[in-house]
């Protein structure tokens, strides 16, 4: 099994080849740069959310999504979503993706999957669908 340092070295090599290895780290030329970018983007997003409030932030995201859909067209937008889903599946692993699907399958228009699982006593192990690092 690879040590943490070996794994970081491999991720750094991939980043230096132009691959994004940290979610939110797009544009960073090293692993450390991608981690730094992701942290900054996360903090910036939280600051903006605090400024706009929950509803305003949600609306801003919705408008951005609609704009992107117009730019890419329906098929391009669908392809982008598919690629994102595949990336997320790789990050979580098969077991995590399965567990996330179980939770999503419990959701209804009136109740989230998490709420329903709690109400019905269904165990959903959310630690399985955290990004593997």
Curated annotation (Swiss-Prot):
The keyword Repeat belongs to this UniProt entry's keyword annotation: yes
PROSITE patterns: SMALL_HYDR_PLANT_SEED (PS00431)
Cellular component, GO annotation: cytosol
Pfam families reported in the protein's UniProt record: LEA_5
Region (Disordered): 1-133
UniProt-listed GO biological process terms: response to abscisic acid
Keyword Cell membrane among record annotations: no
Keywords associated with the record: Repeat, Stress response
Region spans: 3 X 20 AA tandem repeats: 24-83
Expression induction or repression: By abscisic acid (ABA) and osmotic stress.
Cross-referenced InterPro entries: LEA_5, Sm_Hydphi_plant_seed_CS, Small_hydrophilic_seed_prot
Annotated signal sequence range: none
Function field: Lea proteins are late embryonic proteins abundant in higher plant seed embryos.
PANTHER family for the chain: EM-LIKE PROTEIN GEA1, EMBRYONIC ABUNDANT PROTEIN 1
Record-stated family: Belongs to the small hydrophilic plant seed protein family.
Stated name of the protein: Late embryogenesis abundant protein B19.3
Taxonomic lineage: Eukaryota, Viridiplantae, Streptophyta, Embryophyta, Tracheophyta
Gene from which this protein is expressed: B19.3
């Amino acid at each position: 099994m690879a040590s943490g340092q070996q794994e970081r070295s491999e991720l750094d090599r991939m980043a230096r080849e132009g691959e994004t290895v940290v979610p939110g780290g797009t544009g960073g030329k090293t692993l450390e740069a991608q981690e730094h970018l992701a942290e900054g983007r996360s903090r910036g997003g939280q600051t903006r959310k605090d400024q706009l409030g929950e509803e305003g932030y949600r609306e801003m995201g919705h408008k951005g999504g609609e704009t992107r859909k117009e730019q890419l067209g329906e098929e391009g937008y669908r392809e982008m979503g598919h690629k994102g889903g595949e990336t997320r599946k790789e990050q979580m692993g098969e077991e995590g993706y399965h567990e996330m699907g179980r939770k999503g399958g419990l959701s209804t228009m009136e109740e989230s999957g998490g709420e329903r699982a709690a109400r019905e006593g269904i165990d959903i192990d959310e630690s399985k669908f955290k990004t593997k690092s």
